């Protein structure tokens, strides 16, 4: 599948990526190759593969939720770059 220059520019605009004319040509070739590969994969017969197939045979890999040792407040703050009133002090995330 060969993408047009306009299609590549449209995708770049949606992704908020500025591309030079040279980059558009490179991306056009690369994206077209990726889409060709996807088209090839779509032709693979997977009718005998169960939808939830996996190879490890494991049914659950989660450990039991067990309460363990906890750090004291002093231990937790020991390497904090900045602290105030016994709490981590971080730069504001939201502006008022």
From Swiss-Prot:
Taxonomic path: Bacteria, Bacillati, Chloroflexota, Chloroflexia, Chloroflexales
Encoding gene (name): gatC
Protein name (record): Aspartyl/glutamyl-tRNA(Asn/Gln) amidotransferase subunit C
UniProt GO BP: glutaminyl-tRNAGln biosynthesis via transamidation; regulation of translational fidelity; translation
Gene3D superfamilies, per database record: Glu-tRNAGln amidotransferase C subunit, N-terminal domain
General function of this protein: Allows the formation of correctly charged Asn-tRNA(Asn) or Gln-tRNA(Gln) through the transamidation of misacylated Asp-tRNA(Asn) or Glu-tRNA(Gln) in organisms which lack either or both of asparaginyl-tRNA or glutaminyl-tRNA synthetases. The reaction takes place in the presence of glutamine and ATP through an activated phospho-Asp-tRNA(Asn) or phospho-Glu-tRNA(Gln).
Keywords: ATP-binding, Ligase, Nucleotide-binding, Protein biosynthesis
Keyword Nucleotidyltransferase: no
Catalysed reactions, as listed in the record: L-glutamyl-tRNA(Gln) + L-glutamine + ATP + H2O = L-glutaminyl-tRNA(Gln) + L-glutamate + ADP + phosphate + H(+); L-aspartyl-tRNA(Asn) + L-glutamine + ATP + H2O = L-asparaginyl-tRNA(Asn) + L-glutamate + ADP + phosphate + 2 H(+)
Species annotation: Chloroflexus aggregans (strain MD-66 / DSM 9485)
Enzyme class: ligase
Cleaved signal peptide residues: none
Record's subunit section: Heterotrimer of A, B and C subunits.
Protein EC: 6.3.5.-
